[in-house]
Amino acid sequence: MKGYQFEDTQGTFHLKKAENISYLYFPIAGEAGLKSSFTPNLGGDAKIDQNTFLLEPVSAENLVNNRNSRNFWCNVKGIGSWSLTGHSAEELSKKFTEMQDDSEVTAGFMWQKTTRESKKYQLRGEILSFIPVDKNVEIMLVTITNTGRMAQTVTPTAAIPLYGRSADNIRDHRHVTSLLHRIETTDTGVLVTPTLSFDERGHQVNHMTYYCVGWSGNGEKPVDFYPTAEDFVGEGGNFERPYAIVKNAEGVKAGTKIEGLEAVGGLHFSEITLEPEEECSYLIFTGITEDIQEIRNLSKTYTTREKVLEELEKTKAYWQEKVNVAYHTGDSDFNQFMHWVSFQPILRRIYGCSFLPHHDYGKGGRGWRDLWQDCLALLIMNPDGVRQMLLDNFAGVRIDGSNATIIGSKQGEFVADRNNITRVWMDHGVWPMITTKFYIDQTGDLELLEKEAAYFKDKQIARGTRTDTLWDESYGCWQKTKRGVREEGTILEHLLLQNLTAFYEVGEHNNIRLRGADWNDALDMACEKGESVAFSNAYAGNLADIAELLEAYQKKTGKETVSLLAEIVILLEDNPALYDSVEKKLHVLEEYLHTCEHDTSGEKVEISIEKLTENLRHKSEWLMEHIRKNEWVKDSEENGWFNGYYDNHGRQVEGDTKTGVRMMLTGQVFSIMAGTATEEQIRQITKSADRYLYDEKVGGYRLNTDFGEVKTDLGRMFGFS
């Protein structure tokens, strides 16, 4: 995308005719839960969670093709009907011609302003959109200006379709769930309170009200309303050419109640005459609440345009304060771009993987990796509280080295997985150590290693391969000892269990098993024989890093030993002959897992820091040397790189094959980061990556070469383009 220009040092930018760029949208959210997407034409959606969508859910394709978006119309007496968003049949017919309206989008952190000017209608419209930090409501401040030389008489109407239910109902029971709608008009707008909510949780009594209310800048209320889609668009009409707008039709009055129809927040204001250069404004509020009083309070809080602008400034200041990192280079555009890069982790925390049009993976919530990524971002921009966040996150580790995969809404809250056999991502044990090391490197807080945290417990045991038949919900979600006391261990102990259990869980080539996938979720079809050499590198690097932290801890504290779970001694056998044997390593792992299937002994042992450090280094060095010796591949021209994976037939994935060269980026990155790759190997990897993965058209390196097949013995990623 080209053409945007930064306006200040806080990332504010503007872009002319932004609607001519396909799939463009902007995130606007608050901290109370409402999260929205806005296109330049005010398309997009708004929701609190998967089951609570204010506006109809959209994917990337819907951004271009949906008709029912947020809109604000002016019926101009004697001329026609003009959409301030550009979302009208008339304006769309002018697209890519000289008759197209002049338009511009200006935006900053969590706010957007669209400006549109029509030669035909001699009007300029400005729509400022944002969400207050502490409220679940979108605020639109609409300003209409007469740019002509003569007085203009216009009738303004806000028109926002209210979806008001779960995203599941976009196809499943779409019509049936509209029958649940109970629509009511008040003196300021339209309220929709469905009787029930239909979603994967079953049929539940609904307590949410979805609404659109508004008034003019001087407090004038709408004269009437268009509360249903069928009355608004009319017979044969649609949201781009609605009957009610074209005919300036009379709506229903306040106090009207309607059941069982699709709803629209249609607010029909009184006719107003604007002299040349005169302007008028309207305040539109679209939101979700469980308390009707919150809607009434809006008319008391935001009585004027000035009150809305005051709220906007508070909102801007709040989000700018979150990004307290500044960049100073010779390129001012790069500095401002990096301001947005710094804001991205905040957007990721709010939206997750599920709630933006191009990020529609799953149904919301955060995953295990997200917990640690949040810590990394906060360490740079808001370090207060990171220590406690780390401690709380470690409580999601199971005693078998795996971890909870269902994350609660509160910090340190984890939910039991009730599936018989759960999916295990083999990379999950990597990230806590990487985050902890970064935290200690930044703060020098080596004492964190001796702080204690609980262990998560549910019926999943033996790293997701068996279930604990003795566990039920009365046991609770915290690991206990045989004495019924909650088991707690140091952060060091948690790190050791995650990385040591992974070290022993190997496939037939003595690399760590791929299991359900690694950080590439799409490598998900090799759970029996798949191995991730890429993340074996990462674990090898972690073992070396733990040893380094232990040395620094000993030097700082003067302590000679650390207290660890007695059962962990099984995993601390230090014998090259053991490391060379897949069978013996799996036996050690099984022996350990058997000792803590239900409860732990509750016993602790003192381990020499010096011996533990030596032990970890031996394991790390063995694993790195094993990879150097067995996983280095070459093409016919002697270009070399590391194989990163084994498929579900136990075959090496990368190399110079009969169907061509196969190379993946992940294994190269982690072999270099961990220290597995020698200086000479790094040079060869770089040369090979430049040869096989670099693509100037995409501006960088691809994740892999084209394998030329849908490789169903490794993962669904090979079905993607």
Regions found by a protein language model. Give the residues of each.
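Short glycine/serine- and small hydrophobic-enriched flexible loop segments
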Residues: 376-379, 434-441, 541-548, 673
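The feature captures the catalytic groove of carbohydrate-active enzymes
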Residues: 280-284, 290-292, 360, 405-407, ...
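Conserved active-site and cofactor/substrate-binding residues in soluble primary-metabolism enzymes
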Residues: 369, 534-537, 541, 618, ...
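Aromatic (Trp/Tyr) and acidic
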Residues: 662-690
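Anionic coordination/interaction segments
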Residues: 1-372, 383-396, 408-409, 422-446, ...
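Conserved H-X4-D acyltransferase segment
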Residues: 367-381, 667-678
